Regions:
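C-terminal cap of thioredoxin/glutaredoxin-like
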Residues: 133-204
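Alpha-helix N-cap/helix-start motif
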Residues: 56, 86-87, 120-123, 154, ...
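Sec/Tat-exported extracytoplasmic proteins
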Residues: 52, 67-70, 97-101, 114-118, ...
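Short histidine/acidic/glycine/proline-rich micro-motifs that form metal-
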Residues: 52-54, 80-84, 114-117, 148, ...
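Structural microenvironment flanking redox-active thiols in thiol-disulfide oxidoreductases
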Residues: 72-100, 104-132
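Extracytoplasmic/secreted envelope proteins and their assembly/folding machinery
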Residues: 60-67, 90-94, 107, 124, ...
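Extracytoplasmic thiol/disulfide redox context detector
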Residues: 2-85, 155-158, 162-163, 195-204
Length: 204
């Protein structure tokens, strides 16, 4: 019994230590929710990003490994920021890739093209050529790029980028309640997100 009591105290103290590591105002901020959150028992995590962002590029492999570890009670999505013309063009590229079901391979190819090959994808024609190099027919690319659905999603990205006051990327949001800005260490950022997921689960 004594050993069990000591173990319980140790676990409790360890948990308190972990929780004390993260402080509101220093490691994360509480925000006024501008994202409609569906209370379906799942915690919603959003990453605001831009393909042209070097920090987002270096974060991507760590983020993908983290995503694969998420349980069914957490859902993750990306929000391509749409501050100006080039960001809006890349947001259109993001949603076109989604519509073409190219998935993570497509997104990784974009990051590599920009940051490793110097192909900055600054026009519709450049995007058509790039997606063609991935084996997608030009007609299919143009159909999705110019679709009502993709245009509406880009419009939503513009609105959310403003409402969420995204002033740097990568930036992450948990349940439309907490904001976490980029950290020096990618794992530190995800440790904070894991902490916020844990405290949000009872409220989802």
């Amino acid at each position: 019994m004594r050993a069990k009591s000591i173990l319980f105290i140790f676990i409790a103290l360890f948990t308190l230590h972990i929780d004390a590591q993260f402080q509101q105002g220093r490691d994360y901020q509480r925000i006024s929710s501008v994202i409609p959150i569906k209370k379906d028992g799942k915690v919603e995590v959003i990453e605001a990003f831009w393909y042209g962002c070097g920090a987002c590029f270096s974060f991507e492999p760590t983020l993908n490994r983290w995503k694969s570890s998420l349980d069914n009670d957490t859902k993750f999505s990306k929000l391509p920021v749409a501050w100006g013309p080039i960001h809006q063009l890349h947001a259109k590229l993001f949603y076109t890739i989604e519509a073409l079901n190219l998935g993570n391979n497509g997104h990784s190819a974009v990051f590599n093209a920009i940051h490793k090959e110097g192909n900055y994808l600054t026009s519709d024609n450049a995007i058509v050529d790039f997606l063609g190099s991935l084996g997608v027919e030009e007609a299919d690319v143009l159909k999705q790029m110019n679709s009502f659905s993709v245009k509406q999603k880009v419009k939503r990205s513009i609105e959310l980028s403003k409402k969420l006051k995204v002033n740097g990327v990568p930036m992450m949001f948990v349940d439309g309640t907490f904001k976490v800005q980029a950290q020096r260490n990618h794992n530190d950022m995800l440790d904070i997100i894991n902490y916020l997921i844990k405290i949000q689960k009872p409220n989802s």
